[in-house]
Amino acid sequence: MLDFNLAEILFENRPNKYWKMLRQIGVKNAVGVLPRSFSDWRKHDEETPWNYLSLVKYKNMINDSGFILDAIEDNPPMERVQFNLEGKEEDIENIAKMIENFGKLGIKTWCYNWMAGIGWFRSFTHLNTEFGKVSGFNINDIKNAENYHIKTDRKSLWENLKYFLDNIIPVAEKNNVNLAMHPDDPPIDNFTGIPRIMNSIESYDKLLALNTSPYNGITLCQGNFTLMTENLPDVIKHFNKRIFFVHFRDVIGNKNNFMETLLGHGKTDMHKCMEAYNDINFKGIMRVDHVPTLASDDAYVPGYSYLDRLYSIGYINGLRDSVNS
């Protein structure tokens, strides 16, 4: 029987009406971000969101709003580690401190990524007659983009990732915190002159082989993984217990040219995916991810509209009930 934690990401630094709506429809679990905003007029906390005092206030705010904080999905500064720059030891120290504080606070999962330079990217957000306001990517839109100001190569990125894992996995093991690597988004080979290395099924096999700890795992973002494979349910079964966190979303197109869609309107058989999660007895965290913006929605973050996220939560619950029946 499927018994995962259906969570929702809370971007806001204060409770708002959407948080109330989530509780009204039965969502109890939350995914948070690092608390980068000031907590009060003294402006103490912004530069150190990985510190215990910043995190405990943030967790208490989420708990007081009726949610359980299951995961943090956010990278602290780690560019010096990714590019092997002077000062990388300080970044490692801060990340280790963050993981220790997650353990103290009962935050069981950290979703991070290895997108060196620029993180996830969309090249358009526009109105679409079928889905409303949609976001997507076309590789032709970036062909004249300036290269990132730091240079590296694929081999170095893998070596730097191994250094990171060798230093952080022991801290995660000691503090019972799962590390869940998010794929490159989009999963193309190169972005602004920087190679992407977490962009295929084979790259995830290599990630898990770099450090075989059971705490070294995956954020299976379906919108990215479905651009890497024609059989996402088989990939779910392949990675099995190393999947700690799922982003349940879909797209149409391919990795070089895609658009994000309503659930049920994309390229993936979502019911078969849910059956695959049942087959592996998935007990982790699942959340809605990038969605279109429907008419009259006042959400301000492209891909994270309120109305379609509520629709998607209902869709996931319906699929889960169908599989469980």
Q: Residues of each region from the PLM?
A:
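Histidine-acidic metal/acid-base catalytic patches
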Residues: 1-5, 12-14, 19-21, 26, ...
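Structural motif corresponding to the early beta-alpha repeats
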Residues: 33-162, 166, 173-174, 224
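Active-site glycine-centered loops adjacent to acidic/histidine catalytic or metal-binding residues
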Residues: 30, 182, 221
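Basic, amphipathic N-terminal segments that precede the first structured/catalytic domain
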Residues: 21-39
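Active-site-proximal beta-alpha loop/turn segments in soluble metabolic enzymes
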Residues: 141-157, 183-193, 296-299
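An acidic- and aromatic-residue-enriched active-site/binding cleft used to recognize and process polar
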Residues: 11-14, 35-39, 74, 115, ...
